[in-house]
Amino acid sequence: MRVPEIYHPHPAPPYRALPHPLATIRAGISGFPSPAEDYVGRTLDLNERLVKRPSATFFMTVTGDSMVDFGIQDGDTLVVDRSIDARPGHIVVALVDGEVIVKRYEMIGKRPYLCSGNSRYTPIPVADLDCQVWGVVRSVIHEYPV
Amino acid sequence: MIGLVDCNNFYVSCERVFQPRLEGVPVGVMSNNDGCVIARSNELKALGVEMGTPAFELQQWVNQGRIHLLSSNYELYGDMSARVREVLEEFSAGVEPYSIDEMFVLFDGFDAATTRQLARTLYRNVRQFTGIPVCVGVAPTRTLAKLANRAAKKLPEYGGTCVIPADGAETRRLLERTALGDVWGVGRRLVERLALQGIETAWDLRQADPKAIRRRFSVTLERTVRELQGMPCIELNDADRPRDRIMTSRSFGRHTGDLGELQEAIRQHAQRGAEKLRRQDSLARAILVFLKTNCHRSDLPQYSPSVVVELPEPTDDSRPILAAAHQGLEAIYRRGYQFMKGGVMLFDLVDANRQQLSLLDTPERAAQRDRDHQLMAALDELNQKMGHGTVRLGMPSQNAAWHLRCAHRTPRWTTNWLELPKGAT
């Protein structure tokens, strides 16, 4: 039986760990061992670096060009963490009138706004909208064609 | 104390996390193969749509845009269920999944105020972290925790969490308001028989003499009485309970990371589960396969995955169940981990006698089903007479594709790179 492919439900363990470069740095010339030596032989795991809380982390694909000044481009993958309470300055995924949008949450004067990273779009005042934060963007993954 | 965390309208809630437009409107989830409703939002319940309603009866409402019907997306539900479990595990080492959307959480060693606070935190965090709304009931026994959970869900004054002690005015009031049929493990036939004795509410049953109940009814019901009195005596996989899901799992004799050994263990569990399914005249729609490493060995790498595989159609036939278990195991297995425990859960059960036949059903398929039925009956009889494992099925090889009808399945938002949700900038 083959139901459409099954993907690993949750990449909790390091799926593909990379070898850590050997630490060759010495602390000064005194010969005391460097703290970095404790990590010799460890491997690096991108999940561990990017996904702080797996249960609350979701990936999302970006559409549109309104966030390019914040380094978020059409087609990029966002790492969204729902366990963080949104504060001004965070890039958030918000539900606005039933749509899912990505903006920067800012306070202008004493009023909250959703701002774009593109001068062609003006800030949207939140007060007049049915708006809810879905999650906070922790990082963006941009893959280059190679 | 034992907490029960129950996800509200779980399948519909999973869909709503990624489709905010489904919020507040009637939504149903359909089984993919037999085309009937297997999950409903509150709005759909309010329209009088029952579980098991065939999709074609609702087609007109769908066309009018009054309701939304979605195909089931078990991959999504399995992933969201694992996330809920993970959030709970941040608070308690004792989390026992009871079904895909219900989990018992052990709350030991807290005073009453802390317990209440913890229940609120679980309620809030699961909702925030995963997007799934839940209710939390906490009490000294599983039966009372179930009852508290029901109160948390149905009675607005509790606001989603309800903590009750073994005794006291509040516990009494709740038990008095709970009909017998809503007590865990009390089926319809028992309700009728108990009514003849003048026992009509959970409180009446609690007041009954456990020994007399044992004589007149069963040990199982006696345990329910004691549980209602606040004395824990039901284990999670109590064999005598009628089930809405079948769990078979066990710790391995020793740690193992060998795929062959794991396959053998999962095969046994799946076959045992299928036998239990046939004994209680149920069919399953889906199977969950899980593995666990030893969480007490922090020196070893930890990995406790689970996955849900949908069965090609509701079935009690060991062969497709084994095939699905095998496929699930392959999907979650990773080398380099020492597993300590594994098992399967068969869920979304339907009554075998009330099974809706697929629209695609043909006389040939009906005849095939009869033959399958006889084969399974023969298998069970042999195993019963000659001892377990006399006749066993091997793990099937991957072959024939099954045709799934899942035209309305939503994307696998969390488990497929090509189907991630979109965020417009």
Language-model-detected regions and their locations in the chain:
Chain A
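Hydrophobic beta-strand signal
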Residues: 79-80, 93
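Short, positionally conserved secondary-structure boundary motifs
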Residues: 1-68, 99-100, 107, 122, ...
